[in-house]
Design a protein with these regions (language model features):
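Hydrophobic transmembrane alpha-helices of multi-pass small-molecule transporters
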Residues: 65-68, 180-184, 210-214, 286-289, ...
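Residue-level signal for short hydrophobic patches within transmembrane helices
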Residues: 16-35, 39, 62-69, 145, ...
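Transmembrane helical elements of multi-pass membrane transporters/channels
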Residues: 21-40, 142, 153, 176, ...
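Small-residue hotspots at the loop-to-helix junctions and early N-terminal turns
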Residues: 48-61, 136, 140, 199, ...
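Short runs within selected transmembrane alpha-helices of multi-pass transporters and secretion channels
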Residues: 74, 142-161, 169-177, 198-213, ...
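Short alpha-helical transmembrane segments in multi-pass integral membrane proteins
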Residues: 1-23, 81-148, 190-246, 302-367, ...
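Small-residue-rich hydrophobic transmembrane alpha-helices
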Residues: 53-113, 117, 150-169, 263, ...
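Helix-terminus/linker motif at the lipid-water interface of multi-pass membrane proteins
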Residues: 35-54, 123-130, 186-193, 253-286, ...
Length: 451
């Protein structure tokens, strides 16, 4: 039985309605994912303790460093599929879908091997405190055993979003989130499995979401239907996908590596700092919900409209998406600024842990609009086929500048707040660069020669 075709042609109709109708399911899906990630940390922090919380809550930067490059590759696949879908070239859509999945299988196996074998080395390089190291190694190794499922889900989700279907991934995230929370309570709360239970619960939930996404694609009646026997490489399309995806992957890796350097400096302040900053990172994740929602909407919208030659419509959509993302991110930032003490106590009641999380919130929260602007322009440029521009901007501002600032500033002001200021400073500088390029460059006609 064929699944309901929920793809959306974003080249017609009200720009505002198309953008919001796409972004809202992405927002809700990411909200579910962020909630279960947060509940993961809350359960570990309450049932196991602050050392375990430090291991789990501070995991985001390392996980993103290991997975970010691969996720970027599948952003490239989504861009290519969106462009062909907008141009009504459905034969290319079919070929790109099967190339995407063949690539995902290879990347998933590679990431699993890298995560399992290199986790101890990376955690040692990150100067993880001795009282947290063994727990962190156990958590990460178990987590990375689910890498194949994570990659396959992201590949499938990217395909669905590229053709305008943001609702199906929402349903799958709701289901997997419920599975994760239930298993957390069972494994960590009832069975006392500690961080191992949290990791196993996460892996199982990732497998559930991947299976649901694959079933959806194999039962679709649209041009993006997945046929298992047709999975294989179309080399010209693989080259096109990687030409779009590698810059996005490198951009993710740049951000992740810089953040791992930040985390390694935080680790030198001890497990209280790790737990406090880890708690903050979980709360900060809610800020990324509107940003990510409009980033996904912008990438699909710009890709489809430029693929269809709707250049003025693409410009209007870019403005609407970026402004909405900035407004929502800043609203959440203001709320976090005032509610930080209450938010941090959800994870752990230790006064030292709470104080560090609150301090980071008060330094960074009011600058979230700059973060949203940078990600919004990046999404527009990727959708327009100019993924190299955000890659180089992030390399200069979010990697080289951020790491240089921390390295030099800590020698003058050896305080953890010095580290926290790295983010607002580098977000602001990148915004200036992006604004100049966005206003001056003719990014909107980048695809005319390739489609």
């Amino acid at each position: 039985m064929a699944a309901i075709n929920r793809s959306t042609d974003m080249t017609t109709g009200s720009i505002w309605k198309r953008m919001v109708s796409f972004a809202v399911p992405v927002f809700l899906g990411n909200l579910c994912q962020q909630l279960y990630n947060t509940v993961d940390s809350v359960i570990v922090g309450k049932f196991v303790g602050k050392q375990a919380l430090a291991a789990v809550a501070s995991s985001g930067n390392l996980i993103f460093m290991m997975t970010g490059f691969f996720m970027g590759l599948f952003i490239g696949a989504g861009i290519v599929i969106a462009q062909y879908f907008g141009a009504k070239n459905y034969e290319k859509v079919r070929a790109a879908v099967h190339t995407d999945f063949a690539f995902a299988l290879c990347c998933g196996v590679l990431l699993t091997l890298l995560g399992v074998f290199f986790t101890p080395t990376i955690l040692t390089w990150m100067r993880t405190p001795a009282d947290v190291l063994d727990t962190s190694i156990l958590y990460f190794r178990l987590y990375f055993l689910g890498s194949l499922a994570t990659i396959l889900y992201n590949a499938g989700m990217g395909i669905l979003q590229a053709v305008g279907d943001s609702r199906s991934p929402l349903y799958y995230l709701v289901i997997s989130s419920a599975v994760n929370v239930a298993l957390d309570l069972l494994f960590v709360g009832a069975m006392d499995m500690g961080v191992a239970g949290a990791a196993v619960a996460t892996v199982i939930s990732q497998v559930v979401s991947a299976v649901l996404c694959i079933i959806k694609l194999t039962r679709s009646d649209g041009p993006y239907r997945l046929e298992i026997k047709r999975i294989g490489f179309d080399l010209p399309l693989l080259k096109k996908i990687t030409s779009q995806g590698v810059p996005s992957g490198v951009q993710n890796s740049i951000i992740a590596i810089a953040n791992v350097v930040v985390q390694s400096n935080i680790n030198t302040f001890g497990s209280d700092a790790m737990a406090g900053c880890g708690s903050y990172s979980k709360v900060e994740g809610f800020v990324f919900l509107p940003i990510t929602a409009f980033v996904m909407a912008l990438t699909a919208f710009i890709g489809q409209d430029l693929g269809a030659g709707q250049f003025d419509r693409a410009k209007q959509g870019a403005r609407i998406g970026i402004l909405c993302s900035m407004a929502m991110a800043e609203l959440i930032g203001v709320a976090l600024f005032f509610l930080a003490p209450y938010a941090m106590r959800l994870f752990n009641d230790d006064p030292a842990v709470v104080a560090i999380g609150v301090r980071q919130s008060h330094i960074e929260a009011l600058f979230f609009c700059f973060l949203a602007f940078a990600h919004g322009v990046s999404a527009v440029l990727r959708g327009a086929g100019r993924a190299q521009v955000p890659m180089y901007t992030m390399l200069g501002c979010w990697c080289i500048l951020r790491v240089s600032y921390i390295t030099l500033a800590l020698k003058v002001w050896p305080d953890i707040a010095t580290i926290f200021w790295a983010y607002p400073i580098t977000w602001s500088v990148s915004c200036v660069v992006f604004l100049l390029y966005y206003l001056k460059a003719d990014w909107v006609h980048a695809l005319e020669k390739s489609l």
